[in-house]
C-alpha cells in the first residue's frame, strides 16, 4: 500500500504562488510524493484567505478540490459536525502551543485515517504534535 500524505496550508500556498519563497521546494516535493495528497476544509479555508490577493491561485486551488480526474493532486477528507468535539480535544491537548483549527483538524485526521506523514512548512508545531502511534510525524519537505 502506498504511503498517504496529509498536506497543510503552507505548501498549498507555496505551490500556487510562484512568488512564495518556498515555491520551488514545495513544487519539487509535490512531484516526489505519492498522489493524491489529503487535506480538509479548515486547511483550504486558511489557504484561500492567504491567497486572497491572487484570485487565479484561489480558483486553481478550489478546482483541485473538486477535480473528478483520477490522479488529481488533492483530495479533501470529510469532517462531520460530530467530529468537532474531537478536534476541540486536540486543541485542548496542545493548548500550550495554541494550535490553529487547521492544524488540529489535520492531527485529528491523521489519527482517524492512520496517516503519519505531513507535508508542511510548520515544522515548529508539527514537531510537537504526535501521530496516532504517539510518535513524531514524518515531515516533508
Q: PLM features: residue spans?
A:
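Short, flexible helix/strand-to-coil boundary loops that buttress conserved ligand/catalytic motifs
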Residues: 16, 122, 130
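PIN-domain endoribonuclease scaffold, especially VapC-family toxins
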Residues: 3-5, 24-98, 108, 112-116, ...
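Metal-dependent nucleic-acid phosphoesterase active-site entry motif
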Residues: 1-20, 39
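Short aromatic-hydrophobic micro-motifs that form the base-stacking/packing surface
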Residues: 119
